[in-house]
């Protein structure tokens, strides 16, 4: 029984790692090649295109200048579409409140539903006037975009194209 549980946990963690490793991986501060500042406004990013070289480790300094909660998330289009269901659930559970994030409720609900923790290394969720950072190693040339998956924002084209040079 113990072996069965171990294998189940091992295989499920392998699947999770593989699902994100195909887009890159969390970078190390000591390996940062460049810093890119990202400004989030209500339903758009500046810059709206990001040029990357395969193998680069980028430190993204992200600030939300908008009046709403926004997310900066590095992923494929398909991953964004899947993540949007989690973000909708966060709104339905009143974790996302337009211009606020209820961190206490997030923490409580995440005890039974880990997807509500929003603890992804490729993403940051910010209230207005807040800042965050992501250090990301682009070790693949998979077609990526940075987007906000707060309900309605992706549909409003809050997307930054990631180009590989």
Q: How should these model regions be labeled?
A:
Residues 18-25, 44, 65-69, 98-110, ...:
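Extracellular/periplasmic metallocenter environments
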Residues 26-57, 115:
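N-terminal edge beta-strand
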Residues 32-36, 54-58, 68-70, 130-132, ...:
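Envelope-exposed proteins and targeting segments
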Residues 60-62:
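Aromatic/hydrophobic beta-strand junction motif of beta-rich domains
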Residues 84-88:
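Outer-membrane beta-barrel and related beta-rich outer-membrane complex signature
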């Amino acid at each position: 029984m113990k072996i069965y549980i171990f294998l189940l946990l091992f295989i499920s963690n392998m699947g999770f790692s593989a699902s994100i490793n195909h887009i890159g991986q969390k970078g190390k501060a000591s390996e940062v090649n460049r810093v890119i500042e990202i400004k989030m406004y209500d339903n758009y990013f500046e810059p709206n295109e990001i040029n990357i070289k395969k193998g680069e480790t980028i430190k993204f300094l992200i600030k939300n200048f908008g009046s709403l909660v926004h997310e900066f998330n590095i992923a494929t289009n398909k991953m964004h579409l899947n993540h949007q269901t989690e973000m909708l659930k966060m709104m339905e559970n009143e974790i996302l409140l337009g211009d606020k994030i209820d961190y206490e409720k997030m923490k409580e609900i995440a005890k039974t539903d880990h997807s509500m923790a929003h603890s992804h290394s490729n993403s940051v969720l910010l209230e207005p006037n807040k800042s965050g950072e992501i250090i990301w190693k682009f070790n693949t040339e998979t077609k990526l975009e940075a987007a906000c998956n707060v309900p309605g924002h992706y549909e409003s084209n809050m997307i930054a194209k990631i180009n590989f040079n």
